Amino acid sequence: MMKSRTFRLSVSTLVGALVGVLMAIVGVYVTHSTEEPHTSLHEMLHDAVPLDSNEREILELKEEEFTARRREIESRLRAANGKLAESIAKNPQWSPEVEEATREVERAAADLQRATLVHVFEMRAGLKPEHRAAYDRVLVDALKRGSQ
């Protein structure tokens, strides 16, 4: 009786964790579509700040660099998620293999978040000082909307 209950609890916990990881990955893909290189933050920046040609050129280069970096990290995230799925398929309970695969997913997701923030601040540095306040407002507004 106790073993069966413990097993059900373990499986339920594992399924819940897997659903959480999958939801996080879906969120990453929805917010970082590879088909559209410009994020909504990028578009809002163009609407809020009158960029000159030099700023546009600088930001476009930074955007291209970030797109390549983001794709590399997203590839690692997909691979890590695949490892997690394989680990669970081999042994559908919390195990050292599932733990390690979960940590790989977490590392890749954290790397993506960090790279995105570095990119945001690199973009800001590419603006004229008089345009940075408007950029900051757009950034803060976007983050606030995302947290609601």
Curated annotation (Swiss-Prot):
| Annotated GO biological process | response to cadmium ion
Q: Which UniProt keywords apply?
A: Cadmium, Cadmium resistance, Cobalt, Nickel, Plasmid
Family assignment from sequence similarity: To A.eutrophus CnrR.
Q: What does this protein do?
A: Component of the NCC cation-efflux system that confers resistance to nickel, cobalt and cadmium. May be involved in the regulation of NCC.
Q: What is this protein called?
A: Nickel-cobalt-cadmium resistance protein NccX
Q: Which gene encodes it?
A: nccX
